Structures are given as structure tokens and as C-alpha cells.
Amino acid sequence: MLGVLLVLHGSKIPEWKDVGIKYAEYLSRYFNLVEFGFLEFNKPTLSEALSNLLAKGANKIVVVPLLFATGTHFKRDIPRLLGIDGDEKKIQYMGKEIEIIIADPLGFDEKIGEVLVKRVNETYNKNY
């Protein structure tokens, strides 16, 4: 069964968790097993979120970093926190081999650009 694991950076500000909750709820319309985890500061951690998916029966997991670009978190931290070693895309869980695929960072996307335009206009109109 496919599991989707959203990865958020995390913050000392508790409201960061609300973003994870909202994106997980949104993706739950399309996928049965969706969890989110944070790289630092907030709970659930990435490892805890992975454990939740595995406990619910996920045997293939697509990891979706909510990051804009490739960097240290993407290249080093996410694989390490998921227990992925090198180019290996599998982990062992209760005697089973679990495939983990990490999606690319968000990068540039015109739909995200449209959201940015909307935010600029909302902010400008609210203040002028």
C-alpha cells in the first residue's frame, strides 16, 4: 500500500504544525495513507511520521519534501532520518523490505508563482 510522507523544515514557532496538518488533509483526498514530519524543532519528527506510515501498512512510500530547492536537508538529512543508506532506496521494517522514493523539491512551478502573485496583491491591498 502506498504511503505519502510530507517533509517540512520545522520551526520554533508552533504554528508550523498547522501547515503540515492542512497539507496532509488535502492530500488525504487523493491518497489513503498520508503523514507529515519535521526535520527539526516540531513533532512529529520525520522518523515518527515514517513509523506511523509503516504501522498503518505502507510498503511503498513517496517522500515529498516541502522545500523549494535541493540543499543539505534534501541531500543529506532526509535520507539519514529515514534510514536510507547511500543510493539504496529500501529499508527493513519487521522483516519486510520497504521501498522509499524521495520526490524532488518543489523548485519553480507556475502554480506556486501564481500563489506568490496573489500574496503580493493581498499584502499590498491590505496595506495601501
UniProtKB/Swiss-Prot annotation:
The keyword Metal-binding applies. CDD domains: CbiX_SirB_N. InterPro entries: CbiX-like, SiroHydchlorin_Cochelatase, Sirohydro_Cobaltochel/CbiX. It holds the Pfam family CbiX. It catalyses: Co-sirohydrochlorin + 2 H(+) = sirohydrochlorin + Co(2+). The lineage of its organism: Archaea, Thermoproteota, Thermoprotei, Sulfolobales, Sulfolobaceae. Its EC number is 4.99.1.3. Substrate binds at K43, F68, A69, T70, G71, T72, H73. Belongs to the CbiX family. CbiXS subfamily. It comes from the Archaea. The active site is at H9. Catalyzes the insertion of Co(2+) into sirohydrochlorin as part of the anaerobic pathway to cobalamin biosynthesis. It comes from Saccharolobus islandicus (strain L.S.2.15 / Lassen #1). GO terms for biological process: anaerobic cobalamin biosynthetic process. One of its GO terms (molecular function) is cobalt ion binding. Keywords: Cobalamin biosynthesis, Cobalt, Lyase, Metal-binding. This is Sirohydrochlorin cobaltochelatase. Co(2+) binds at H9, H73. It is an enzyme of class 4 (lyase). Pathway: Cofactor biosynthesis; adenosylcobalamin biosynthesis; cob(II)yrinate a,c-diamide from sirohydrochlorin (anaerobic route): step 1/10. Homotetramer; dimer of dimers. Gene3D superfamilies: 3.40.50.1400.
